[in-house]
């Protein structure tokens, strides 16, 4: 493999501290978005409302959403939301975002330390950038969910296991920390956190036919610690929520979602398709890596010896690919393959499926690449696995700019640009220009130097720069993200009703009082208005107001205020 980059310890501050460089750059690019964006109604606003209710009622282990038991998630993330609320006096999107961003940095840092020992600064930065800009991983860094935190604990668990198994960097505390990390993954998100690390370890030990390892790594000590911590948690839930809440937690939410999901039910093959676009823009490279890793190994240079005496420390102990282009699979490569395959198979067997559930496998998908690269050497398809997406982004960028500048008119896009005028603002255009230029430069390096790392690094950097530039119009986008903007127009002291809104029940997190939602039944709203003698604020979608006579009649009684796709009016009874 050609190496035109500086080695660790040489060069400037960026090459001496490649991971810190990537993390600081990522933080700077994402900071404005995290600081200014609104909360989404589906999950984020619900978490805030649940936290408010828990603080008001003094609940710590059993949570409720408007009086109804909410046993969908364990308490750790709600504790974080509650703590931030107490510390800042309000719900801070920036503060809560840190509990997605920092775990992402920890995950990437661990994978780099685990896999990239002795590698060039450019390779390390490229792999870190790839991890952080896989589309679903990047999205999970920005949204307020517990998935990234759970992923961090899963990575910590598997890293701890591998240290114990290989003896490389093993610590006396590892036998205790392995079950602790597994429990914390469970305590963050639920059953996937409990199942993924032991399943990956079990499949790996089975492949290696290390039957004694089951007792050593997944024996009574491991399960005893997990069971003890889980019993303590369940006991606290029982005391606070009672048997009905326990049944909801253990039966409905756990077994129900796995066997016969009441939400997010998808076919078995769903993840086989979803993982391709979730790993974009590195899908081709990583899919090719996975296939190359599965292909039979031929002409191994070094005979592997049986038993634990064999070196098991992964790519840092293998010979240079140029000297030995077809070595046998390292234990680390086998572990990563077992983790990816077993996790996707496990998730596919569950009835409830969402693309974001795949997040824990993404670090292993990305860092499988340098392991395979060391074993088989750099190939042309690896460079073009990155280059094809660079070309796609370049073509899209060059095609979009004339449209956004108004030089080219496309009738099909006129309505969209009219509905979303912020798409024509300078920060959006600048972001597209930055992304396009970065990929043009990446293509040049691909053709001129025939390397994969610089184009990959530029592709990721271009995405971050585009997000940074576009963040200047987040305040204009916020009305389309959440309800904060329209709720800021709600007057004090009125009752609030909603109709034709998606998940409006948690608007109380903004206005400090409960609302009445009339779903898709404006006739019930009309009856309620007629029967009430109190001032009433009505919130709905502007598109519905324009087409439904009942709403038009109600809104004609007051001043109509607009924000993004929503509008409201206040009806005062005289």
Tell what function each PLM region has.
Residues 2-5, 176, 292-303, 317, ...:
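Membrane-embedded architecture of ER/inner-membrane glycosylation machinery
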Residues 2-382, 476, 558, 563-566:
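Membrane-integral, polyisoprenol-dependent glycosyltransferases
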